[in-house]
Regions:
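Sec/Tat-exported extracytoplasmic proteins
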Residues: 15-22, 37, 56, 94, ...
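Residue-identity detector for threonine
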Residues: 16, 39-41, 48, 75
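Surface-exposed patches in mature extracellular/periplasmic domains of secreted proteins
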Residues: 22-41, 97-107
């Protein structure tokens, strides 16, 4: 997992806490830094975002799936639920979860969710 060096230790602590949490949330796929071109300004381009279990935690806008294939937190152990230890632990470290409506979305933020995505907000 590649992330910005300024948050690397925080990321180690987060994943250690997730691993040691009684919930034992199963993680099989993790993504972080991803260069998306000189004009891209997204958090993955800067190394300040992480995606977990992308296939089971889709990105969706107004009912149209943009990435991944499902989000079934009640039946799929790899799907991240709002009350999961993963969301709680990231939040305790100052990160936001894409499962919440994105306040900075340029269009209807209520219709956009990215359940795989966590963004570093800082302190």
């Amino acid at each position: 997992l590649s992330v910005h060096s300024a948050i690397a230790q925080d990321v180690v602590e987060i994943f250690t806490e997730i691993y040691n949490d009684p919930e034992q949330f199963p993680i099989h796929d993790v993504g972080g830094y991803s260069w998306r071109g000189d004009t891209a300004t997204g958090e993955h381009n800067c190394g300040t975002a992480i995606d977990i279990n992308a296939n089971e935690n889709y990105q969706i806008r107004d009912g149209q799936v943009l990435a991944g294939s499902c989000w079934e937190p009640e039946t799929n152990p790899y799907s991240i639920s709002p009350d999961s230890s993963v969301v709680r632990i990231f939040a305790e470290h100052g990160w936001s979860w894409g499962g919440d409506a994105w306040a900075y979305s340029s269009d209807d933020s209520e219709g956009y969710h990215d359940y795989m995505h966590f963004s570093y907000l800082g302190e």
